[in-house]
Amino acid sequence: MRHFSLAIIGSGSGNVLVPEDPAGQVALVEAGAFGGTCLLRGCIPSKIFAHTADVAAEIRRAAGFGLGAELTRVDWKAIQDRVFSRIEQVSADGRRGRAGTDHVTLFEGRARFTGPRELVIDDRTPISADRIVVATGSRPVVPPVIAESGVDFRTSDSIMEIERLPASIVIVGGGYVAAEFAHIFSGLGVAIRMIDMAPRLLGPFDTGISERFTDLAKRKWDVHLSAQVTRVRRDGDAGIAVDLEDGSAVTGDLLLVAAGRQPNTDDLGLEAAGVARRDDGRIQVDEYGRTTAEGIWSLGDASSPFQLKHVANAEARTLAHNLAHPGDLRPFPHDWVPAAVFTEPQIATVGARIQDLEGRRPYVAATQPYSGTAYGWALRDTDGICTLYADPETGKLLGAHILGYQASLLIQPLVQAASTGLGVAEMARGQYWIHPALTEVVENALLKLSLS
């Protein structure tokens, strides 16, 4: 049995862990294409598609700015080629680089634990390691009523690879994946029908943001909320129908399942290594990334409560330090974790939501609409808002939530302020805010907070 100083299962954020110092031999195991979900089937390709939909939406809005433009053609194949030619090249380059690293052995196959710090690759190649890191990511959840229906469906893993654009898509789910793909395909001219069990889309987000986005979504998509799917069936020669508990049916040409994600931990043989899992399937780790088995660590979607690539990367950097400095362990940086949804309009969030604060602690709130700023006038924006929560006594930010144009950029100075402990008053008046830039939305929201 070949032995390594370090074995890493997963080539997404796990790839960050490979030490530059070739003091020991490293095994890197990947069951699929090199690079992980974010690069191949997740955040990166979907955001390139989303920007294409943004451009299409701008064209449709051109008349409101006195411009005579119209969207006359959508070349789906050209859009796909633009996305995947870049993605596939990055994946191939990454694989080639790792395979060519002297102290790294790349195993292309599925790893399974056979004992403490022992693995077998594709049930053929046994290896062992002093330390093993599980970074296997996550995959889409498919409810049994759909999985067992016999009806063709797509998930985020495969929807971007469809050969042609359908006339309509039925999306089961109302979270960030559902919202982003609804934006992508509606922007390209596809009729969207959404079905969600929750009373609002993006339910885990701040209530005010979730309610506002739901109202906006209903203006352009056929949205069915508090809806329970009872059956999925074929409808005619090529269509599908989703039957709901209230007796209605939602029909379309293609079915996209965006009902959440689950960690890729169920077929790793973790019990053979003494690694415990939580009820939701995530590997149980402490604040340093250690599992319940000595010498075995985990990061990213396999164990983290945050299904976010920037969190997985931060955990990987922390874990790289911990592996190199066992006497000086650092905790995972899980404070002030921001997130964004690249739908239309964008949504960005960090910190406490209104439902976290009401009845639990003192707070003050302020909301600034985009329409109350000069750049908001330029955008003709009547929907965008920035909502902030702060502690009235300490003057520190508690939470920030933005819905609107470039929300993912506008949230960043608020993330920085919260992360460094900068007070609201100092942030608002301790620096210049460029006039009449869109950042005045944030400035004005800060100034509206009534502090003691």
Segments from the language model and where they lie:
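Rossmann-like dinucleotide-binding cores of NAD(P)H-dependent redox enzymes
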Residues: 85-91, 160, 166-170, 176-236, ...
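FAD-site-proximal beta/loop scaffold in flavoenzymes
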Residues: 149-166, 249-325
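Short hydrophobic core segments
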Residues: 7-9, 111, 126-137, 171-172, ...
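Glycine-rich dinucleotide-binding loop and its adjacent helix/turn
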Residues: 43, 136-191, 195, 223, ...
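A Rossmann-like FAD-binding core segment of flavoenzymes
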Residues: 105, 112-120, 188-287
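Flexible, glycine-rich terminal cap/loop adjacent to redox cofactors
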Residues: 2-33, 37, 44, 48-58, ...
